[in-house]
Amino acid sequence: MRPEEEGMAAGVGCARTGADIAVQTGKGESAFDPRGREVHGVVLAGVHCWGHGVLESLVCRPLLPILNRPLISHVLGWLRTGGIEGVTTCANSDTAAIRGALGASGGPEPAITYYEDVMPRGPAGCIKDAAEGSQADVLVAVEGAVIPEINLRSLIDAHLESEAALTLVVSSTRAKPDLRHDPGEPMGIYVFSPDSLAGVSPIGYQDIKEELIPQLHRWGRRVLTYSVPTGSVVRVTGAASYLAANRWALTHLTRSAAARAGYRRVGESWLHETALVDPTVRLAGPVFVGPESIVQSKSMLTGPTTIGARCIIERDAVVSRSALWNGVRVGAGAVLDDCIVADNGLVGPGR
């Protein structure tokens, strides 16, 4: 499909700089064949803090469990599915925790190296540092707290065909976004030509929006916005969006025909083969029950709900639209709705 059919508005100028900006949508497939191009992935896992929230005190955002796997492992799986086998993960003081979690997650991650930005470098600085010594023709950078459901191959095609220095994935409700009036919301996914990073300072905090893009404009380099439908990239920015992402992932799994290793499907629910769920338990909607968990008699699980490993749901309890992490115990007759219960949490019995 030709770019003009997909909504590319070539030559739309930036009034301030005069640089070329184009718009491409995420539907369909490009005719450009990037075979033979070496592509390297960069995951930006050193995300900004939420503030002094409860979840932040428990775990860094890329390690939040989504379907009982770290959020960042879903990002890495997306890169691997798109054909990227080498990834550099950029983190901060959470590097050791992320390395340990990914080693135990059992997910389909590509080969990973780590870059620890002890001093804050910002996203552009981290990407430049991660690319040092790389022979890649293309760099795909993605935040570590998103779940993309877009065709990575088509995104790379669009970037290469446009000869852009930088491509930003944005979400828009319009089929053909108007860059001047509706530029779309950035989704935390970028495709770089390596030479676009030449002007990024090797020291200090370097941002993409505030520093790199204006610099590319000044140099007359082309920037492409690649528009995808709203909801095709799920971002986790806080507790509410975390619950929404967990529910989205479970609903998406339920609607797909894919199998999940170690789990058996019961209606809309997924039960681990080592989980013990009493026959009298009522399952309503998509429910995900992890390894070695026990759900006792006459309980009710209403989806979308995820239950981690080694949890115990005592008799007559009700768990609805919630995310329970590992080792949680819910007392007999307790009622949970729209809740997050962290590792080893205890919910007392109900009346």
Language model feature labels by segment:
Residues 89, 96-179:
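Conserved beta-loop-beta/alpha segment of the NTase-like Rossmann-fold superfamily
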Residues 138-140, 147-148, 153-160, 167, ...:
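Catalytic-core segments of class I nucleotidyltransferases/pyrophosphorylases
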Residues 2-4, 10, 14-99, 110:
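N-terminal glycine-rich phosphate-binding loop and ensuing alpha1 helix
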Residues 217-311, 318:
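Extended, small-residue-rich solenoid/repeat segments and analogous flexible loops
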Residues 44, 66, 90, 117, ...:
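Generic beta-sheet signal
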Residues 3, 10-19, 23, 46, ...:
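Glycine-rich hexapeptide-repeat left-handed beta-helix
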Residues 71-75, 125-129, 212:
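Well-ordered alpha-helical segments embedded in enzymatic catalytic cores
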